[in-house]
Amino acid sequence: MNFNIIDWTYNPYDHTGYIFILHKMEYVLDLAYFFIKTRDEGIKEIIFDILNSWYLSCNDKLDNPWIFHDHATALRAFNISKFLNIMKNYISEDQFLLLQKILAIDVNKLLMDEFYSKNTNHGLDQSLSLYKASFFLEVDNILDIRNVAIERINSELKFAFCDDGGHKENSPAYLYYGVSQVLRALDIGYKYEKENTKIYFPLDLLKKSCLVLGYFVQFNEKMPLIGDTVEFKINNFL
């Protein structure tokens, strides 16, 4: 396959889900895990053909709403950071530099106030991705980037929940996702900075939110179909 002719803006299905999956790049992690298991250099070659094609095609399209969707950009930065972590012992200097270039593009985009989806679940994911990326991107102002991320994370967490534990986006699904985001934020802060983490959420409020979520769960372990909630079971929540 000739990756050099891929049009990363092409959406043959005219479907937002397709283009979202294409640009969040979770499949790159799947390929990385497959490479680590098999040590098949052909798999790694495919990975970097994909990444190089994306970089050459997209680095000058910073205003394209498909490539730089507010949520897809956040998840791509998160996935590239994770890729750097799990593949650090298997990549060349040139491959490392390519990943740094891609991550820098996404980080710079996420830093822009006009791109930041403030006070939304997307904004929190953007901030969490910015925080994670600050441990893998090698630039001089990395501490400034991390501090911006921490400030945004704490602001998003404070805004998202009411005093009674409810979620302001106001559906069972968003409460579930919101509590999941809180736990992920606390976990990622401890993972990278241990007791020095500055990411904060009041424990009493978290307990209230978990209690509210518990009252939402029906006898069949599913959430009521209120608002934009779709049918799903809560599994391994904590």
Give the location of each predicted region.
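Hydrophobic alpha-helical membrane-insertion signals
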Residues: 1-5
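Surface-exposed beta-strand-to-loop junctions
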Residues: 6-8, 25
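Active-site flanking loop/helix segments enriched in acidic
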Residues: 10-12
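Aromatic-lined, polymer-binding surfaces characteristic
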Residues: 15-217
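Acidic/polar loop patches that form or flank catalytic/metal-binding clefts of enzymes
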Residues: 198-199, 221-227
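Short, surface-exposed recognition loops and adjoining beta-strand edges that mediate ligand/DNA contacts
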Residues: 203, 207, 225-232
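Alpha-helical scaffold segments of alpha-solenoid architecture
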Residues: 211, 217, 222-223, 234
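Aromatic (Trp/Tyr) and acidic
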Residues: 232-238
